[in-house]
Regions:
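Alpha-helical segment proximal to the catalytic Tyr-Lys
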Residues: 150, 169, 194-198, 262
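Canonical Rossmann dinucleotide-binding motif of NAD(H)/NADP(H)-dependent dehydrogenases/reductases
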Residues: 2-39, 43-44
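Short C-terminal tail/terminal secondary-structure segment
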Residues: 114, 119, 170, 242, ...
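Substrate-binding pocket helix/loop in short-chain dehydrogenase/reductase
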Residues: 118-122, 126-134, 234
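Residue(s) in the substrate-gating loop at a strand-loop-helix junction
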Residues: 165
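Short, small/polar-rich loop/turn modules that mediate ligand/substrate recognition or access, typified
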Residues: 197, 202, 239, 264-266
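Active-site helix of classical SDR
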Residues: 145, 181, 189
Length: 278
């Protein structure tokens, strides 16, 4: 960071999960000198998604644990609870960041809801299940951005990073709601980037591919009795020969959040080991 630059403040949603992308981004930004506000709908993430990879989750402290870890590393850090799909909560999370640290420079919209496995076939998808995925993944991104743009405009500087998915760049069978929501995140990112381009605010999306997180581990466990073999099968389908890590995604976020990324906006960057090359 330039010696004349203020301390940048980042708000990152979806930070309650073990092996999650959110905590990895918080570590990366905190390690780069940013103050960090970590957020989630509950201290350990959304209860219906809280399927951790066995013993690896032992001792996981959720949001409080992330704060303790970053604070011990010398990072100014705080946590806030809120549901991104609720208008009042979105505004309150942004207000909390501004009141706690005096400003908000970086917003990372990482909170997401998967499509429930039992609703894979379109004839079986209830409207409320479809709506929930769109409410969190797309409407939540909109609400958080809408709340954050005001403080960023007032400062004349901002970085918005929306976590989409490789599913937002192609089609995923039996994942209509999730795929539609992640395509929507990319479209919204591109539109918003034009709206705020003259305000010193950049807006970009990151599209992770197969990434070793607790959610992917749980998916592999459901798909096969041999979890390691299933994870290896998925890795073998990736050109670089391995699953991504949360840190791979965090490295991309670190660039988009940086001072040097000011001429890059409206982009959707795949972090997928070379799977999508469009």
């Amino acid at each position: 960071m330039d010696d004349n630059s203020p301390e940048r403040v980042a708000l990152i949603t979806g930070c309650g999960k073990h092996l999650g992308i959110g905590p990895a981004i918080a570590r990366a930004l905190g390690g780069d000198g940013k103050a960090v506000v970590v957020a989630d709908v509950a201290p350990a993430g959304a209860p219906n998604l809280n399927q951790q990879p066995g013993d690896m989750a032992a001792g996981w402290g959720g949001l409080p644990g992330v704060v303790d870890e970053l604070t011990a590393a010398g990072v100014r850090c705080a946590a806030v609870l809120g549901d991104v799909s609720r208008e009042d909560d979105a505004r309150a999370m942004v207000d909390f960041a501004v009141k706690t640290f005096g400003r908000l420079d970086i917003l990372v919209n990482n909170a997401a809801a998967p499509q429930a496995r039992e609703f894979n076939d379109i004839e079986d998808v209830p409207l409320d299940a479809w709506q929930h995925v769109l409410d969190v993944n797309l409407t939540g991104t909109f609400l958080m951005c809408r709340a954050a743009v005001g403080p960023m405009r007032a400062q004349g500087w901002g970085r918005i990073i929306n976590i989409s998915s490789i599913a937002g760049r192609t089609g995923s069978a039996r994942q209509g709601a999730y795929t539609a929501s992640k395509h929507g995140v990319i479209g919204f990112t591109r539109s918003l980037s034009r709206d705020v381009a003259r305000d010193g605010i950049t807006v970009n999306a990151i599209c992770p591919g197969g990434t070793y997180t607790s959610r992917v581990f749980s998916s592999a466990r459901r798909s096969s009795g041999d979890i390691e073999a299933e994870l290896q099968r998925r890795a073998d389908a990736i050109p670089v020969g391995r699953l991504g890590t949360a840190e791979d995604v965090a490295n991309a976020a670190l660039y988009f959040a940086s001072e040097s990324s000011g001429y890059v906006t409206g982009q959707a960057q795949s972090v997928d080991g070379g799977v999508y090359q469009g």
